[in-house]
């Protein structure tokens, strides 16, 4: 008997994108799976429309947008409560190869020391280009980075690799592990929550693995770009706020004491460059967002005042 997998998708006003993802998932070879779609406070009726079109999926409805973390946590909670063996978190703006889940489950079953595994991820617009070929962390610099971004697939990306953190675009983990670590940090809302969970899993002694033979394709950018350009560009100031605030939270939580001086200096320099760029380009709403992110990141303030960073189109 195959281990059971709950495939967790979060939909927010994205009927076409989520529908394409579900259609792709219907072609997978792994039989013992259930698609669990969390409708994250959609205002366009897309959640109910998708359930009507795909009655076999499980629909969980949230009255409000709980962010990437809160939405996926609703799916994790359902998966754990229903007794699934595994949870697969999958961004709704993805397409999958039919055998992608077979590879991930079989690898986890054969390697009990592995706590979480991710597929090889390509861009969807050009499937010859990688989006993520493994993710790493420099504790001395306090920087997160991925390998292979926007590069052609080569031999080094076709090898199994232990990585420092797993992208939240797609990963498989055991529910028994989630019971120990806890779920995604809800106060992070979105961005770097995958890093935080990865570090918690690693702290339990598990390995984090990149699987080169499990392949998916990512549209990318759905969560951080608006469809129309505002006065300060396509990227909402909230994105910059959350990215920098959560970056500082991670640094405070996970930087070893002996790396604090170098990591602090590098991140002061990096954030100063961002602020300088916004000042020169006269993107003052975004500049204000980054300043607030630094204050809240250092103080530990949790509730972001999103309204402060809204910009007029």
Predicted regions span which residues?
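Acidic helix N-cap motif at the loop->helix transition within catalytic regions
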Residues: 19, 44-52
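Short, acidic, metal-binding catalytic loop of nucleotide-sugar glycosyltransferases
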Residues: 23-32
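Conserved donor NDP-sugar-binding/catalytic core segment of glycosyltransferases
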Residues: 95-131, 137-138
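Non-catalytic, C-terminal membrane-associated alpha-helical segments of glycosyltransferases
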Residues: 256-313
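A short, conserved alpha-helix in the catalytic core of glycosyltransferases
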Residues: 164-183, 187-217
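Short beta-strand-to-loop acidic/aromatic patch adjacent to the donor-nucleotide binding site
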Residues: 84-95
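Short, flexible, basic/aromatic active-site loop/helix in glycosyltransferases
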Residues: 138-164
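Glycine-rich, basic loop-to-helix element that forms the pyrophosphate-binding segment
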Residues: 61-82
